[in-house]
C-alpha cells in the first residue's frame, strides 16, 4: 500500500500569517499521525516563510511515523538534515525564492553534486530521494547516484488529468516502471488531490509514498483534518 505523507508547510503558513502559535504545527503533525497519516513532510526554505528550522528540531522527537525533510541542499539545509536525521531526505532543485517546487533535477548537470550528497546522507542512515520529472535518461542517471528513491514531480499529470487522464498518466507509468527496474523506490508529489490521486495510484501500484500538502489542507477546511486524511487514504486503497 502507498503511504500518505502529509506536508504541513501550509499549516505553518497560516500560523506565520498572524504570529503566535496557532495553529500549533507540532500538534497538527501529531494529529495527522493519529488520524492515519504514515508520514510527515516538511520543506524548510532559507527565509523560513512557512516551516521554521526550529519547527524541524521540535518535530523530530515527536514523529512516530516517517519523517521526510525536503528542500534545496544549501549548506544550512544539509546541516539541518544531518543533525535531525529524519527517515528520508528529498533533494529538490528549488531556487530560494520559489513559491513552490516547479521542476525536477537535471541530474546530468548535477550528477557529481547529487552523488556526493547521497553518499553523505546514506552514511548517516538517512534514506535519500531525488526529485525528478519523467525524463528516462534523467532517471537512469539518478539511479547511478546511489539514491534509494526518486520522487516524481506530478504537476504535469495534475494539469492534464482533466483533459485526458490516460495520456496524462502514460509518461509517469513509463518513468516509474524504469525506476522500479533499476531498483529505485518511487515516491510522487505535487498537485495530487482527491480528484486525481486514485487513478495515479492505481496505475503505479508499486508506488511507495505520496507527499501531499496544499490540496489536503484546503480539503481539511471543508471536511476537517481527520476526515480528509481518511479520504486521501481511501484513494490510496482503492
From Swiss-Prot:
Cited CDD domains: PNPsynthase
Site (Transition state stabilizer): 151
Entry annotated with the keyword Oxidoreductase: no
Single GO MF annotation: pyridoxine 5'-phosphate synthase activity
Main location, first listed in the record: cytoplasm
Pfam families linked to this entry: PdxJ (PF03740)
Protein keywords: Cytoplasm, Pyridoxine biosynthesis, Transferase
GO CC, any one term: cytosol
Active site: 43 (proton acceptor), 70 (proton acceptor), 190 (proton donor)
Enzyme nomenclature, EC number: 2.6.99.2
NCBIfam families associated with the record: pdxJ, PRK05265.1-3, PRK05265.1-4
Protein name: Pyridoxine 5'-phosphate synthase
Species per Swiss-Prot/TrEMBL record: Parabacteroides distasonis (strain ATCC 8503 / DSM 20701 / CIP 104284 / JCM 5825 / NCTC 11152)
Amino acid at each position: 500500500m502507498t503511504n500518505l505523507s502529509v506536508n504541513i508547510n501550509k499549516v505553518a503558513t497560516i500560523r506565520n500569517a498572524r504570529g503566535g502559535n496557532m495553529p500549533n504545527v507540532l500538534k497538527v503533525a501529531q494529529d495527522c499521525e493519529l488520524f492515519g497519516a504514515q508520514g510527515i513532510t516538511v520543506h524548510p526554505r532559507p527565509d523560513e516563510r512557512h516551516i521554521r528550522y526550529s519547527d524541524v528540531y521540535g518535530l523530530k522527537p515527536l514523529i512516530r511515523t516517517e519523517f521526510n525533510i525536503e528542500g534545496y541542499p544549501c549548506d544550512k539545509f544539509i546541516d539541518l538534515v544531518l543533525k535531525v536525521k529524519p527517515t528520508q531526505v528529498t533533494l529538490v532543485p528549488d531556487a530560494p525564492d520559489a513559491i513552490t517546487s516547479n521542476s525536477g533535477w537535471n541530474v546530468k548537470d548535477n550528477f557529481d553534486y547529487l552523488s556526493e550528497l547521497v553518499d553523505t546522507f546514506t552514511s548517516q542512515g538517512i534514506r535519500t530521494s531525488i526529485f525528478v520529472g519523467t525524463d528516462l535518461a534523467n532517471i537512469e542517471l539518478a539511479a547511478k547516484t546511489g539514491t534509494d528513491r526518486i520522487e516524481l514531480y506530478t504537476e504535469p499529470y495534475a494539469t492534464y488529468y482533466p483533459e485526458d487522464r490516460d495520456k496524462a498518466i502514460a509518461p509517469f507509468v513509463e518513468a516509474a516502471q524504469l525506476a522500479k527496474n533499476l531498483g529505485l523506490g518511487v515516491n510522487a508529489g505535487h498537485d495530487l488531490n482527491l480528484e486525481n490521486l486514485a487513478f495515479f495510484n492505481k496505475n503505479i501500484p508499486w508506488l511507495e509514498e505520496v507527499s501531499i500538502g496544499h490540496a489536503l489542507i484546503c480539503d481539511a477546511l471543508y471536511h476537517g483534518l481527520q476526515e480528509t486524511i481518511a479520504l486521501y487514504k481511501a484513494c490510496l486503497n482503492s
